[in-house]
């Protein structure tokens, strides 16, 4: 999302200060229009590098999350309430890679918006909506993991497919409603009319956000974030206690193999750890952006444009991180990827393939 990347703090510069590169002289986004925004293009070398970096992120977000969705939806062994949440999260990140990143890439490198005023607003709505959708999904996933770790045997009856569906529906409906109401009602621009008028030009895409809405945006981000931090703190305390109890019982009984309950608890702790890393990656990507946006709104938008864009693209790259995290920690996901890319997923009864080693 780029709530702030669409705000009054944006101008027509791109991700790194043009002064850092040998840029050509200033041009216009539309040479034949008097109201055209000024464009300061990069020289060919840096321009190619930026397109490669941003394009790689978009491709990774699209392909990686598509693999996650395909794996979970195709293989029956992965059909669980928790995994459906993960697939829905991957869908939000996939849409960032398809609907947001390519257009932001052109704007960041070229310094102009070439996709029309209507799609400027729609692009911002997608940006905001998919961001908060990811956030809400991660929050619900953390609650799911807490239930699974704290009471693994009762977990299947507490977090059912119905509960998962309600969480998914809530995440999508709330985030889309919030994103579109923020942009299309014009409430975020209240009190900034003169500034908006002075910044308006053809080839620009600035959506002004006043201090009130910056505070609301930050609050909507902060509340689920605090929930996730609190829940995962409890998860790791419980996991640590369970590990100590299992070790103590193993020594006392000298048993050769773990009980079913212990194996379930171990599996749930591993899942909680992996998804905890995904949450940590999300927070590390998003916190700097939101903190800077919040402070900057009350200091007159003094943050240099290139700093904003660096933060924004760190945020965008977060959409590509989760598939990499799953691939690193989940053997079943690596096996699913292999079956998919080799075409074996097209074979008859491939959906019943055993993806787990244990």
Curated annotation (Swiss-Prot):
Species of origin: Mus musculus
Protein keywords: Cell membrane, Disulfide bond, G-protein coupled receptor, Glycoprotein, Membrane, Receptor, Transducer, Transmembrane, Transmembrane helix
Protein's gene: Taar7f
GO cellular component, as recorded: plasma membrane
Stretches in topological domain Cytoplasmic: 69-83, 144-166, 234-274, 334-358
Extracellular side stretches: 1-47, 105-121, 188-212, 296-309
Topological relation to the membrane, as annotated: Multi-pass membrane protein
Function: Olfactory receptor activated by trace amines, such as N-methylpiperidine and N,N-dimethylcyclohexylamine. Trace amine compounds are enriched in animal body fluids and act on trace amine-associated receptors (TAARs) to elicit both intraspecific and interspecific innate behaviors. Ligand-binding causes a conformation change that triggers signaling via G(s)-class of G alpha proteins (GNAL or GNAS).
PROSITE patterns for this protein: G_PROTEIN_RECEP_F1_1 (PS00237), G_PROTEIN_RECEP_F1_2 (PS50262)
Homology family: Belongs to the G-protein coupled receptor 1 family.
Name of the featured protein: Trace amine-associated receptor 7f
